Regions:
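Beta-propeller and closely related beta-pinwheel folds
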Residues: 330-342, 375-392, 398
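Conserved Walker A/P-loop ATP-binding site and its immediately adjacent core
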Residues: 60-102, 106-113, 136-137, 292-299, ...
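Conserved coupling segment at the C-terminus of the helicase ATP-binding
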Residues: 47, 51-53, 57, 148-149, ...
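Conserved RecA-like ASCE ATPase "motif II neighborhood" in helicase/translocase motors
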Residues: 117-152, 158-166, 267-273, 399-408
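Conserved RecA-like P-loop NTPase helicase motor core
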Residues: 390-471
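Conserved pre-motif I regulatory segment
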Residues: 2-55
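Loop/turn-to-beta-strand initiation segments
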Residues: 80, 127-131, 148-150, 283-287, ...
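Inter-Walker segment of RecA-like/P-loop motor cores
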Residues: 89-143, 147, 380-391
Length: 471
């Protein structure tokens, strides 16, 4: 049998906009004008920038823009392309949209890297497809994705906790970390006042104790650093994420801050040192996409980058609303029992509803109460991770998510009722310290506003969408 001559590589369209016309399997007849504006701006002004941020409002086709840029660079430069999402559910959603609606070949990477199929690994290593995975798959000690040409960060407004957690060692007072917490507390006793040490090591449950947050002065960290390293080395254990985090931080304790509360000790640098994480830093380009990008340097602080090129918001979109929301504040005039009765009545009228809570304790309480209502099904984070089809197909259902601002979207008739239950402003001890102890909440105003904007927008995903929001 004769050897076949390999065919020449197909020519790549000149721009991402031109690529859209070549996607013969797409179901969308054309790009929106706003999408075209962003793509042309990127091609003209940001093609060779190492860090690029683009902002598109909810419902304006941000995912398609990101996938077109990713697919175009994959074809044009034969680059391995990584598309990052905050959650597993969003990974599945993006891959489904890419393959079924946009005509872009995409591959989902979920679970342990040892579970990736040979075909999937080849798709990344040979730049055969757009590879979609979670933030956590890139930000770990030994990621599989170590040679990306381009990394696209979807929902970049939530990137901070996923990125900073890679260099954050959280020691909990209860559970498996109890012995380590006690040992570290004994070391910190030398540099803490008696009242602070009592709060840290005691079992105080008063509201004042629960609000307490503090930081060990940097000069004091220097004085106990060697003893602290020795104690943690002995007590950290041989398994679990704490050991891996300590491996990254151990030789850089003097560059870290130590934050304290009655339930947790957090050791981390103020800004995540992403320049030391080669799978992130060595990419030719990093693209950050969000519906809410601030101008105060918050994105740079979250990602550890000194400079990020921001593309202009498309003309005509700067002040456009994202659907209609009818806000209800029942606690202004009703007591606790009446609020619960109102909530149950609205759930009964709406059929499907979404509840966002501040923590797992509040979420479990809501789930318990809803299960007492006749004919209702409850869906938590795990139930929605693989997809939202079961929830959407139910006539009477409630989705309950704890401290979740992103990743779960319910456009149109999928859900018209949203409950926002006391969402917390701070998501970690560092944020709490700056807001509550230092009075520097101004630093986080954009971040807090972004979280609240994302929270109330879970059920209004387009200009013609609408929902009732109960706060």
């Amino acid at each position: 049998m004769a050897f076949k001559k390999s065919s020449a590589k197909a020519a790549c369209p000149e721009t991402p906009v031109d690529l859209f016309q070549d996607l013969t399997r797409r179901k969308h007849p054309s790009l929106y004008d706003r999408q075209g504006q962003v793509l042309r701006d990127y091609h003209s002004n940001a093609l060779n920038q190492s860090d690029v941020a683009l902002q598109l409002p909810t419902g304006s086709g941000k995912t398609l823009v990101g996938l077109l840029i990713a697919e175009w660079r994959r074809r044009k430069y034969s680059e391995s392309v990584l598309y990052l999402c905050p959650t597993r559910q969003l990974v599945n959603q993006v891959v489904k949209q890419a393959n079924e609606e946009y005509g872009v070949h995409a591959e989902a990477f979920l679970g342990k890297k040892s579970e990736y199929s040979p075909q999937a690994k080849a798709a990344y290593q040979d730049a055969g497809k757009v590879c979609v995975t979670t933030y956590s798959s890139l930000f770990n000690v030994k990621p599989f994705f170590n040679r990306s040409g381009v990394i696209v960060f979807d929902d970049a407004h939530v990137a901070e906790n996923y990125i900073s957690s890679h260099w954050s060692m959280s020691i909990q007072k209860s559970g498996a970390g109890a012995s380590l917490f006690s040992a570290v507390s004994d070391v910190l006793k030398k540099v803490l006042g008696s009242a602070d040490y009592e709060r840290l090591s005691g079992s105080g449950q008063s509201s004042e104790d629960m609000r307490w947050v503090d930081k060990v002065p940097s000069s004091d960290v220097a004085s106990i650093s060697e003893e602290l390293k020795s104690v943690i080395d002995v007590n950290v254990g041989e398994s679990g994420s704490v050991k891996f985090k300590w491996g990254l931080l151990r030789d850089h304790v003097l560059a870290c801050q130590i934050y304290l509360s009655v339930k947790e000790i957090l050791i981390r640098p103020i800004i995540p040192p992403t320049w030391t994480h080669h799978p992130f830093n060595d990419a030719k380009q990093r693209i950050y996409m969000s519906a809410t990008l601030g101008q105060g340097g918050d994105l740079e602080r979250m990602t550890g980058r000194s400079s990020i090129k921001r593309l202009s918001v498309p003309v005509g979109l700067g002040k456009r609303e994202n659907g209609r929301r009818y806000f209800i504040f029942p606690e202004k005039s009703l007591d606790k029992d009446q609020v619960i009765d109102l909530r149950n009545g609205l759930m009964d009228m709406a059929g499907r509803s979404l509840v966002l809570t501040a923590n797992d304790i509040s979420a479990n309480q809501v789930i318990s109460e809803v299960r007492g209502m006749e004919g209702f099904s409850c869906f938590g984070k795990d139930a929605l991770e693989g997809g939202k089809e079961d929830f959407v197909s139910s006539d009477r259902a409630v989705a309950v998510l704890a401290n979740r601002y992103d990743g779960i979207d319910f456009p149109g008739e999928e859900c018209r009722l949203l409950f926002v239950d006391n969402l917390s402003k701070a998501t970690n001890l560092q944020e709490r310290f700056f807001m509550e102890k230092m009075g520097a909440g101004l630093l986080y105003n954009e971040r807090i506003a972004s979280r609240m904007f994302q929270a109330v927008g879970r059920c209004t995903r387009g200009l013609n969408d609408y929902a009732a929001v109960v706060v």
